[in-house]
Every structure is written in structure tokens, then in C-alpha cells.
């Protein structure tokens, strides 16, 4: 919580800058944040602008555009499961297709089968016609029971699937605010279980990729509401990655092959927070020619959500590179 308080203090003390230097730093001003938010809401109506309590409002943002929110976003798998990491099974368990575990066993003891067979033959002698009729009746009975059992097994499996999905289901409210200290968007998550009960922070951490859990995730009080605990996700190299994307666009322009929107989507699809311009570290400046076609500032949040998707792989919010 100390880290959360220090972060809030830093946000409060950092002066607001209204100058636009998106093309050189990858950072955005409050006005550009609003512009990017309008574009996100236009492309994906599940995201909406919202106001904040009077004492929590930021005067550098419009009263009705304090933050962006999307509610009840589904998450069916934890990050560990989504990334394909499996736990060991017990000795009595058998893993089936699609991750299901079969824990019961069928008793195929030969001695028991022999006893049952001898018991059937100890009942005395009957005539051949009675034996034939009895065998036919048994065959019909077996066929009927097999059909009924098959139907029951299918129903049980469907119920098992539904029960398992409901037990794993979580819902998230996602908030995007403007960070004055980093001059980039900042994401907050507030989660609920399948019964609508708020998740503990340690439970929400289960939905964050292990690569970022200890680096970019922090327990904080939601800054746009009172007494609401959240997990904040801030890719601290976000502005540097944006510069990487613009560097790709500039290089494409120099090769007389302007970076159109399709190329840009392909470039971002293969990038993550660890990518950088060859031969440069993230801390170094990247020279970008002015007026080079590439990412527009109103598309900023689409790229931002692309990054967040790698941090929270199991949360299914609306974003797509087609919006570029």
C-alpha cells in the first residue's frame, strides 16, 4: 500500500503538460488522451466515458470524460491456464482431452468376472427354447440400457462443462485513466467471482501474466471511486514501445514503401513490451521524421490495449487491430 500512496502522491505533484510531443516521445497530453478515448468509444461502444465524484475529478479533463470504463468483462481462464501451464495430476486421475480429468476407475478384476460367470451358470438347466428367448430378451435389454446410459452420460458431461465454466468465470470492470506522471494511459482492474463477490487483490493477480505480475501490477485504491481496491497495470515502457512503432513506419517511408494501416497492424501484432529498435535501448531517443505516415494519436488507446492483452491474456475485452 505504501507504493500505492507514493504513486498517488507523484500523480498529484507532477505538473500537467499540455504540449504535444507524441511523435518524439510516445507520450500524450490530456487533450490527446481525450481524442484517443473518443476514437476508442467510437470503434468499441462497450467502452464508455464516465464522470467521477466531484472531489476526485481532474480539472484538466472534461467533467464527463474523466476516465474510460468497460464493465462485466468475462475471464474464463486464469493466466497460468491460458498460457498452457498444467499442474501434475494425482495418481488416481487420468487427463482427458480438453483438460478434463477422469478420477474414477472401472473394475476389471478377472477373478470377479469369473465368479459372476459361475454364478450365472449355477441356476439349473432349462430347455433350449427358453434359453434362446432369454438371450434375446437380454440383448434387447442391453441395447435399451446402452441408449439410456449414453444419453445420461451426455447430459452429465454437459452439466459438468457448465458447472466448470461457471466456477472459473470471473467478471472484470476495467478503467483507463490518464497518468500525469508518465503522460500515458493507465489501466485499473476490479474483479468479481461468478457470484458477483469482489475478488481479493491476490485473486486478481492470478489473471496477470507472470512476466508482468511483479513488474507492472500494483494494488491501489481506484482513483476515480471511494473505497474500491483495484490492481493497476502500467506498462512503464509504453511510450518507448510507441516510439519503436513509429520508427518502423519511418524506416518503411525511407524505403519508399509507406507504412499503411495494414502494415502497421502486422507490425504491432508481433511486438510486445520487450521489443526495441535494433541497436538501441529503451532509454535512448529514437529519431522520427516529422510528417511520416504511421500511428495517429487518436489510435493510441488501441495500441495500449494491445499491450495490456499480453499482461492479462485471459480477460476478453474489446479491442482489435482492425480498428487501425
UniProtKB/Swiss-Prot annotation:
Asked if the Swiss-Prot or TrEMBL record annotates the protein with the keyword Cytoplasm, the reply is yes
Residue numbers annotated as active site: 236
Q: Which InterPro entries match?
A: Atg3/Atg10
GO CC, alphabetical? cytosol; mitochondrion; phagophore; phagophore assembly site
Give me the ranges of the annotated region Disordered.
Answer: 100-134
Question: Where is the segment annotated Flexible region?
Answer: 82-166
Q: Which domain of life is it from?
A: Eukaryota
Which BP terms does GO give this entry?
autophagosome assembly; autophagy of mitochondrion; cytoplasm to vacuole targeting by the Cvt pathway; glycophagy; piecemeal microautophagy of the nucleus; protein targeting to membrane
Name the job this protein performs.
E2 conjugating enzyme required for the cytoplasm to vacuole transport (Cvt) and autophagy. Required for selective autophagic degradation of the nucleus (nucleophagy) as well as for mitophagy which contributes to regulate mitochondrial quantity and quality by eliminating the mitochondria to a basal level to fulfill cellular energy requirements and preventing excess ROS production. Responsible for the E2-like covalent binding of phosphatidylethanolamine to the C-terminal Gly of ATG8.
Stated family: Belongs to the ATG3 family.
Domains (record comment): The N-terminal region is involved in phosphatidylethanolamine-binding and is required for ATG8-PE conjugation.
- Protein name, as recorded: Autophagy-related protein 3
Native organism is Debaryomyces hansenii (strain ATCC 36239 / CBS 767 / BCRC 21394 / JCM 1990 / NBRC 0083 / IGC 2968) (Yeast)
Amino acid at each position: 500500500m505504501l507504493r500505492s500512496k507514493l504513486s498517488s502522491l507523484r500523480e498529484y505533484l507532477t505538473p500537467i503538460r499540455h504540449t504535444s510531443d507524441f511523435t518524439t516521445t510516445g507520450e500524450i497530453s490530456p487533450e490527446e488522451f481525450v481524442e484517443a478515448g473518443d476514437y476508442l468509444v467510437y470503434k468499441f461502444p462497450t467502452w464508455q466515458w464516465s464522470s467521477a465524484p466531484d472531489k476526485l475529478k481532474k480539472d484538466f479533463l472534461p467533467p464527463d470524460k474523466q476516465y474510460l470504463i468497460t464493465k462485466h468483462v468475462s475471464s474464463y481462464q486464469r493466466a497460468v491456464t491460458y498460457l498452457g501451464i498444467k499442474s501434475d495430476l494425482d495418481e488416481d486421475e487420468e487427463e482427458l482431452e480438453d483438460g478434463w480429468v477422469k478420477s474414477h476407475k472401472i473394475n476389471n478384476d478377472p477373478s470377479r468376472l469369473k465368479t459372476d460367470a459361475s454364478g450365472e451358470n449355477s441356476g439349473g438347466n432349462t430347455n433350449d427354447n427358453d434359453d434362446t428367448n432369454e438371450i434375446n430378451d437380454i440383448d434387447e435389454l442391453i441395447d435399451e440400457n446402452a441408449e439410456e446410459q449414453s444419453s445420461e452420460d451426455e447430459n452429465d458431461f454437459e452439466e459438468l462443462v457448465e458447472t466448470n465454466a461457471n466456477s472459473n468465470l470471473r467478471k472484470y470492470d476495467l478503467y483507463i485513466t490518464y497518468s500525469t506522471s508518465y503522460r500515458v494511459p493507465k489501466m485499473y482492474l476490479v474483479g468479481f467471482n461468478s457470484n458477483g463477490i469482489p475478488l481479493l487483490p491476490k485473486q486478481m493477480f492470478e489473471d496477470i501474466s507472470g512476466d508482468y505480475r511483479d513488474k507492472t501490477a500494483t494494488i491501489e485504491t481506484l482513483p476515480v471511486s471511494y473505497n474500491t481496491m483495484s490492481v493497476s497495470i502500467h506498462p512503464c515502457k509504453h511510450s518507448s514501445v510507441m516510439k519503436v512503432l513509429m520508427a518502423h513506419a519511418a524506416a518503411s517511408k525511407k524505403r519508399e514503401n509507406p507504412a499503411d494501416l495494414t502494415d502497421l497492424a502486422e507490425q504491432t501484432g508481433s511486438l510486445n513490451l520487450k521489443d526495441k529498435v535494433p541497436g538501441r535501448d529503451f532509454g535512448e531517443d529514437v529519431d522520427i521524421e516529422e510528417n511520416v505516415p504511421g500511428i495517429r494519436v487518436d489510435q493510441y488507446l488501441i495500441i495500449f490495449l494491445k499491450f495490456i492483452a499480453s499482461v492479462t491474456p485471459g480477460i476478453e475485452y474489446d479491442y482489435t487491430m482492425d480498428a487501425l
